[in-house]
Design a protein with these regions (language model features):
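Histidine- and acidic-residue-rich, metal-dependent catalytic cores
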Residues: 3-239
Length: 239
């Protein structure tokens, strides 16, 4: 079954790479992050494998969107955005007849722009009505889109992207968000940073429930700061 799934993915993702290099790279990034988050969520090996496939294929429907819209070097008009929003439906239709792909994969593709509060698309469904695969892919999709430079926008820093995601408590699955945040390492151990108190410090430990607030060692004072609890040094800038 895995070989047949791989063959189906290779054909579809190959077509996407030809039509749009950015979306191809984005899909690989989303697949990778989604698999990491799925593992943290507790999914088994088969489900993690399938979430990877769903991540690779989540934007396959963009191959049906006109290039002048897909690669427009400016923000889309309302009419153009309405066409762009159909890509998840196009993707589902492309995969619908592929019997070797599970329904979870297909629903992940169809629903990855749905929001927990019902303000997503294409169906505007809410909460647990959104397939788990779609809820998992959604967080990684948003993060990668935020940190990637596009002709019409500058990239967010990883820190700002994480803060944006943390603010989306009404749109995203909170449990999935928590798993994502516990999987993201913004400040690798050993990285030198500048603290808001003016001191230079080195990352010594990341805190799973406070990804923006690692523990650091002050290089001049030799003091360890727990930034989750020390508001005087809360801001961190990588040097």
């Amino acid at each position: 079954v895995y070989k047949r799934q791989n063959d189906a993915v290779a054909v579809d993702i190959g077509a996407l790479k030809i039509s749009d290099e950015y979306t191809f790279k984005h899909s690989v990034d989303v697949a990778t992050m989604s698999m990491i988050v799925a593992r943290k969520y507790g999914l088994d090996d088969k489900q993690v494998y399938e979430i990877g496939i769903a991540g690779l294929l989540h934007d396959i429907g963009k191959s049906k969107v006109p290039n002048e819209i897909l690669n427009k070097a400016a923000r889309l008009t309302d009419e153009e955005f309405a066409i762009m929003k159909q890509h998840s439906v196009y993707g589902y239709r492309i995969l619908q007849s592929k019997e070797d792909l599970s329904m979870e994969i297909k629903l992940g593709v169809l629903q990855h722009h749905e929001k927990m509060n019902g303000k997503g698309y294409p169906m505007g469904i809410t909460g647990d009505k959104i397939d788990l695969f779609a809820r998992l892919i959604s967080v990684s999709d948003i993060y990668d889109a935020l940190v990637t430079e596009r002709p019409y926008k500058k990239p967010f820093s990883p820190r700002d992207a994480v803060e944006m995601i943390m603010s989306m408590t009404e749109e995203l699955d909170i449990t999935v968000m928590r798993c994502f945040l516990e999987s993201v390492i913004l400040y690798p151990v050993g990285t030198d940073v500048a603290l808001s108190n003016g001191e230079t410090a080195r990352i010594v430990e990341n805190v799973p429930n406070a990804v923006l607030r690692p523990k650091v060692l002050g290089l001049t004072t030799g003091k360890v700061y727990d930034l989750a609890n020390d508001v005087k040094c809360a801001n961190v800038i990588i040097l």
